[in-house]
Amino acid sequence: MGPYRVLRTLGAGGMGEVYLAERADAEFEQQVAIKVVHGGALGGAMHSRLKLERQILAQLEHPNIAHLTDGGSLPDGRAYIVMEYVDGIAIDLYCDSNRLDIAARLRLFQTVCAAVHYAHQNLIVHRDLKPSNILVTAAGVPKLLDFGIAKLLDERQARQHTLAVTHADIRIMTPDHASPEQVTGQPITTSSDVYVLGVLLYKLLAGSGPFVITSVRLTDIERAICERDPRPPSQAVNTDDSDESRSIAESRSTNPKRLVRTLAGDLDNIVLMAMRKEPERRYASAQQMASDIQRYLEGRPVIARRDTWSYRSSKFVKRHWLPVTAGTGAAFLVVAFATTTYLQSLRITAERDR
């Protein structure tokens, strides 16, 4: 691949393969990651998406975002991009293997928020902020990777790529790390990344995700993400004496009961505010979310508040209006029947007593 010699395969996916490579022209020693798109029927669309990713990466210069090094085309016409090679592990595995406590996890997460906010300032939405796309080096530096399904918010730039990538871009997502807007095909804004940051923080804190999604059917995914309210992270932590519960707590340098107490309250509210179904009710930005976490770390009041009972009830009725209406009608009929029966019995008793 040009001046690069492939050493091994790092991974493969729907768009193509990623290789570890090094310079082969003796100019200087450098290991890089090279992404090559698939050929075949979707080759044209994937080629356009890789060009878009190259354009996106070229705009980003941030210490916590893997930077673009080079790019080109192979003799068979397939495009490739050359990126900084990040020798690290997924952020959730890094936190667990290093037994980071909750405060350390929050500080690491704040660094990720800063990188995401920087991308947003450059009118770029990542759309795939899962743990495997955020690697942490041995030095503890997180690096945001894979802008392969990112979205440009600049209409003039986006218009140049829209027609070419439309068919390859239909609801591309990781289901358990997707926002309601992604699942339903609604317009994507920076708020979508804020939602997924909430999902990521949920897992870093509680050791599991907010939803268990085993089906690949879109209707099942929509039902899970768009209709069900996630449990607060503190309620996702088991306080039993199982090996799994102890393992999750110990990887956070605590015990299950203390972990629940730590998460309950402000941290629950921070995560749930980021994950609200309605984009306008989430944090206004990744930076605002990071700032609220800082308030928590400093022992100051946070802006996140738990939804009121009346609000949750109204949203439940809106989502399930048909069964609620039917149930309310049935309950009314039961009450009306019982009231009528009771009044009739009173009249019969009164007449008998006369």
Regions found by a protein language model. Name each.
Residues 22, 51, 55, 65, ...:
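C-terminal lobe helix-coil module of Hanks-type protein kinase domains
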Residues 38-59:
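AlphaC helix of the eukaryotic protein kinase fold
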Residues 33, 81-82:
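Conserved hydrophobic/aromatic residues on the N-lobe beta-strands of protein kinase domains
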Residues 90-100:
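AlphaC helix of the protein kinase catalytic domain
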Residues 17:
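Conserved N-lobe ATP-binding subsite of Hanks-type protein kinase domains
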Residues 20, 29-38:
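Glycine-rich ATP phosphate-binding loop
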Residues 12, 60-63:
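Conserved N-lobe motifs of Hanks-type protein kinase catalytic domains
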Residues 307, 315-354:
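Charged/polar helix/coil "stalk" or linker segments at domain boundaries
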